[in-house]
Each structure stands twice: as structure tokens, then as C-alpha cells.
């Protein structure tokens, strides 16, 4: 199980691992699961000709595939019903799934070589997440993923967007790193940080022709609260970004509201 802050690359790393193993792979987003039993076991249907019949889920097919790699994404957002169903599947001493919706409640054994990889966000910052059952946690080896430092972040952004100005990419990496360090400090200046996912989004906007401040307005500022006015988290981050902005007019964007003269120049 890979745990860590949102946007630090857990799912990307898990998918890269799956691809690198060159084995059959299956992806299940448990955070988007409304009906755990239907997703993991299957559904009972009615047909006017066939009558009532049971349809196995894609998960049943996955665990029945030899040497399959199964990615259970957003495990911390899964309904407890999903955890209960997964208990026997993930237990090394059991490794089976009972299809209690099917006639006779047959047992499906997990095929030889099947590997499970899970991702989870753990912490009070994430809404709609649950404290993962200890019994589920014990069924995984946990890898705690940390955020990248500024040099690593810059290397990633440069790799993904080699044609973007290096100074701008370094600025994005340093801004992200600064917010991470401050949010860890506990002094109350920032309650959250710029994730790697957000950094990549900002780099993409730079590639599309936005300047740094414009990209930050879209990809960074909305994550920080505006409560408190001049003392707000958003103002703090805007001032941080401003240190890296070359456009002197961007200073005016920190606090200045559009004037009537400005509004007259806007073409709708």
C-alpha cells in the first residue's frame, strides 16, 4: 500500500510499477464505488426469457487471472463494506472471494501470482476518507511516499515540459517546496501545500502560453483560503509567487480590483 499526501504521485507510481512488470493489470477506483458488492462481487439481473441470473464483476475476473496485478486506488475512500469483502481476498492464509449473490454461493480462489497494490490518503485534511481498518492495513506492506524536494520537482517538470523556460519551472518547483515546508512548520501560516499534481498543472499552463502569475491564479491560489484578507493564506502565497514574477504589473493584481476604465476595455 502506498500512502502519502494528495498529488504526490502514488497512483502514477503504482501504474508505472504495473506497466513495468509486464503482467495482466486491472484498475479499480474504490473511491468512486457506490455499491461495493456490485463492484467486487457482481449483480443479480432479471431477464424475461432467462429469468434471474447472476453476472460476475470485473473484480472476480481480475482475481481469477494468473499473475495479475490489481490496483486498488483510493482505498481510504472505500465504503467499509468493500473492506469486509476484501478481508478474505487479501489474507495470505485464505485468498478467496465468496459469491454470496450467486446460486450456491460459490467460492472463487485468488489465482496464483496475483498481486494487489493499493493507494490511500491518510490524515484529517482529506474529506470523505475513512480511518482504514487495522485488519486491512495488516494485509499490506505500507510504503510511505513523501513529497519531492525542489530539485526533484524541477527535474520532473523539466522532463515533462522540456520546452518551457527553465527559470519558470524552477520557480514553480521552489514555490511548491516552500509551501510544503511552511505547512509542515505548524505556525499556522499555511494549512495545505502545493502538490506535485498542481505543479504539473501549472507547468502545463506555462507550456500553453500563460505567464507564471496567470498560471498560479488558476493552478495554485484556489487551494488556499482567502479568509483574513491581507493576513490570509492566499495573500501569503500570492506574495510568495510575486517574488518570482518578472512582470511588474503583477504587483497590482495582488490587491487591486478592476477599475471602470479597465472594465471599458473588456470585450464580451
Predicted regions and their residues:
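AAA+ P-loop NTPase catalytic core and its hallmark functional loops
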Residues: 1-170
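Alpha-helical lid/collar subdomain of P-loop NTPases
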Residues: 149-268
Amino acid at each position: 500500500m502506498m500512502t502519502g499526501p494528495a498529488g504526490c504521485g502514488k497512483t502514477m507510481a503504482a501504474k508505472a510499477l504495473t506497466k513495468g512488470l509486464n503482467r495482466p493489470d486491472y484498475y479499480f477506483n474504490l473511491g468512486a464505488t457506490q455499491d461495493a458488492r456490485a463492484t467486487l462481487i457482481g449483480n443479480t439481473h432479471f431477464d424475461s426469457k432467462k429469468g434471474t441470473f447472476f453476472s460476475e464483476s470485473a473484480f472476480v475476473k481480475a482475481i481469477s487471472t494468473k499473475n495479475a496485478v490489481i490496483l486498488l486506488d483510493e482505498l481510504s475512500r472505500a465504503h467499509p463494506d468493500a473492506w469486509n469483502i476484501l478481508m478474505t481476498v487479501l489474507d495470505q492464509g485464505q485468498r478467496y472471494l465468496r459469491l454470496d449473490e450467486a446460486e450456491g454461493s460459490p467460492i472463487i480462489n485468488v489465482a496464483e501470482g496475483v498481486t494487489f497494490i493499493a493507494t490511500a490518503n491518510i490524515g484529517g485534511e482529506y474529506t470523505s476518507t475513512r480511518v482504514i481498518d487495522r485488519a486491512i492495513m495488516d494485509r499490506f506492506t505500507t510504503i510511505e511516499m513523501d513529497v519531492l524536494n525542489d530539485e526533484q520537482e524541477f527535474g520532473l517538470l523539466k522532463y515533462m515540459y522540456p520546452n518551457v523556460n527553465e527559470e519558470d519551472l524552477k520557480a514553480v518547483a521552489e514555490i511548491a517546496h516552500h509551501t510544503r515546508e511552511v505547512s509542515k512548520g505548524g505556525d499556522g501560516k499555511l494549512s495545505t501545500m502545493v502538490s506535485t499534481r498542481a505543479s504539473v498543472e501549472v507547468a502545463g499552463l506555462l507550456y500553453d502560453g500563460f505567464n507564471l502569475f496567470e498560471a498560479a491564479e488558476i493552478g495554485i491560489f484556489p487551494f488556499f483560503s482567502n479568509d483574513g484578507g491581507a493576513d490570509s493564506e492566499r495573500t501569503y502565497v500570492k506574495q510568495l509567487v510575486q517574488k518570482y514574477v518578472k512582470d511588474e504589473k503583477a504587483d497590482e493584481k495582488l490587491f487591486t480590483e478592476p477599475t471602470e476604465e479597465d472594465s471599458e476595455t473588456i470585450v464580451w
